[in-house]
Amino acid sequence: MTDFEKGLRLYDHPDIVQRLFFPRREFIEDTENPTALNYFISLEPGISIGCRFYPFRPDAPNILFFHGNGETAPDYDYVAPVYRKLGLNLFVTDYRGYGMSDGSPTGSAMIRDAHSLFHGFTDFLDARQFKGKRYVMGRSLGSAPAIEIAYHYAQQLAGLIVESGFASVQNQLRRIGMAYLLEHDPEPVGFGNDIKIMEIKIPTL
């Protein structure tokens, strides 16, 4: 059985955290153009994650979006109009330490938090009667939490979308100059994207 917890511990190494995450704080109000609503999901006492919701209409498909490592949810004010033109509701979530969120990012926190963020996303839509199909999408680093959600909650999703994602931990750590951390691990797991995605049977792009 794959030890995903071991893989997450690897991504909490201080050198990896420093090279993998680039948190940037950004505070922004609700806006009308584009229509964007702030929403905060509580993870634990003192820690909440700031999200931005860009609505089209209640019966439209809904995308839970995990962004790349150098972005924040408010950055998507510039991209959201494209999704709106396509008839989509877009829900963008940050990570700890990013945007309007509390705390500091780590690899294990990003994956564990994804579960609470998914439940927060579904609760948000249910409370507002947004009944369209639900998808999860990840870009770059965000492919890891997106694949995690699709792996665990496929029955609640209509599909998975991966943009500029990555598969193996070996290739990712090699790109950021950290491959030496794998010298004593013959079967490194990392986030396990390559393992999890083989088990995902919902439509995937």
What are the functions of these language-model segments?
Residues 127-140:
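Alpha/beta-hydrolase fold nucleophile elbow
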Residues 161-171:
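Active-site nucleophile loop of the alpha/beta-hydrolase fold
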Residues 105-127:
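Alpha/beta-hydrolase active-site loop
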Residues 60-68:
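Short beta-strand element of the alpha/beta-hydrolase
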Residues 69-82:
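The serine-hydrolase catalytic nucleophile loop
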